């Protein structure tokens, strides 16, 4: 105590151990490690990170964008490519496409050759996700999101639904997904979740928690996640993937940043900045 929060981080290597081989002092890196499970987090000026869990920072973006990226990149990547087994030509529904995970998921799905439908709350967010490549946008406050998806898919439902909201949205996802389709959620299901539709449709329901390898001490899985970041570095530097920052806060105003997230009005990511 006190606990140091923050899973994501980016910065310049200040010092290395005698066995470090991948990085040198002065290298710019980004990573997702710490903040949970007894590991000190990154709401700080310095962090200690195993070299195997870090990746070179994309050279085309600043440290603010890089610090906001790792958790959402890995989460969206694992959810779509590993859990959802997304392939070219598939139709995918991404809930809350303007959010931190959602806005990355739209781009990764398009890179895989999928057709993307997403849900948002406002016209402003609808414009944002269209710029990211969304093919069909549902304003869920203005229309029935289940019927809207069924209308878009001629009554069949999508091949893969990615739930980034939880609660009743997970239950809605079952009705929006085609028979033998996939539903991936990043949140624990509500105790009142009705699983009958999922069973009747023979859906494969998967969970995605990218923090599991860190919490369980799974070394190889953490190394594999750093490899995902390396691939994302290439995509970002090739201008194929964008990390959108809606607002930055000084580290001393971390509480205000958390309150802003709770409003649900942000698009993309918020970032805490240390003094340079």
Regions found by a protein language model. Name each.
Residues 27-28, 46, 91, 111, ...:
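Residue-level marker of beta-strand positions
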Residues 233-247, 255-276:
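C-terminal capping/lid region of NAD(P)-dependent oxidoreductase domains
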Residues 1-35:
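Glycine-rich beta-strand-centered segment in the early N-terminal region that forms part
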């Amino acid at each position: 105590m006190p606990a140091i929060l923050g899973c994501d981080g980016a910065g310049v290597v200040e010092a290395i151990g005698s066995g470090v081989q991948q990085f040198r002092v002065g290298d710019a890196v980004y990573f997702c490690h710490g903040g949970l499970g007894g590991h000190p987090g990154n709401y700080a000026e310095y962090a200690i990170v195993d070299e195997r869990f870090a990746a070179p920072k994309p050279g085309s973006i600043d440290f603010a964008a890089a610090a906001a990226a790792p958790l959402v990149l890995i989460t969206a990547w694992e959810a779509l490519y590993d859990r959802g087994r997304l392939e070219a030509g598939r139709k995918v529904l991404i809930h809350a496409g303007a959010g931190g995970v959602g806005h990355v998921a739209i781009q990764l799905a398009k890179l895989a050759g999928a057709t993307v439908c997403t849900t948002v709350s406002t016209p402003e967010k609808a414009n944002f996700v269209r710029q990211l490549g969304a093919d069909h946008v549902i304003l869920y406050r203005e229309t029935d999101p289940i019927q809207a998806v069924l209308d878009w898919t001629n009554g069949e439902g999508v091949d893969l639904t990615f739930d980034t909201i939880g609660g009743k949205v997970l239950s809605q996802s079952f009705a929006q997904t085609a028979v033998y389709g996939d539903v991936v959620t990043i949140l624990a299901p509500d105790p009142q979740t009705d699983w009958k539709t999922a069973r009747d449709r023979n859906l494969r329901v998967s969970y995605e928690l990218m923090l599991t390898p860190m919490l369980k001490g799974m070394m190889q899985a953490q190394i594999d996640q750093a490899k995902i970041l390396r691939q994302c570095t290439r995509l970002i530097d090739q201008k194929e993937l964008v990390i959108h920052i809606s607002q930055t806060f000084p580290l001393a105003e971390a509480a205000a940043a958390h309150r802003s997230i709770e409003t649900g009005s942000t698009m993309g990511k918020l970032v805490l900045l240390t003094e340079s």
